[in-house]
Structures are given as structure tokens and as C-alpha cells.
Amino acid sequence: GKMYVMIQKRQKTVEKGRPVEKWDDYLKCWCEVKSLYGKELYTALEAKLENVMNFETRYCKALEALNTKEYRVVWGERIFKLINADYGKYDRRKVVLKGQEVV
């Protein structure tokens, strides 16, 4: 079903001489949360990727900045590290964010 998710951006700072990592809210967006199925599911399992979900959302300019290492998706109490952002097949109408749950 459709629901809000929060995309967060990793911020790295140095405090008292030590590197500190924190996550700041970047973009709240309305997504359709979809489980993997069929060929996509088997490919993920072969690559040892478990607890992977697709977050399908409407395209917006802010989503173009997503490089996968610096962003994550927060859905309720669950956190997903971003492993792919697919802008391609929907001709800039939709973006599919693929996230793996951090457990």
C-alpha cells in the first residue's frame, strides 16, 4: 500500500577530534512499498540480499541527488540502506528506490 517514508542523508562531522556520523531528514515522500517477487526476488537471494523492499515514488528533482551510500529510507520503525535508485524505465515519472533492511 501507499504510505509516507522519510529519506535521510548521512552527515559526517568531527567532534572532539573523533568522526561522528548522524542522519538528517532529507525528504518525506509518499511511496508505494512493494516486496520483491519472481526473478527479482531470486536474484536478490542469490546475492545474499535479504529483507529487500522497493519504494516506488513519484519523480521529483530532490531524488536526483540520491547516491546510495549517503542516503537511507526510514519506514515506520524500520531502516533500509539504499542499494539502488532506478530512474530509468519510468521516463522520469517514477523512481524506484531499492532498500535493504538494517537488522
Predicted stretch roles:
Residues 1-20:
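Active-site-proximal polar cores
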Residues 19-103:
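Short, conserved turn/kink motifs that form compact alpha/beta structural patches or helix kinks used as
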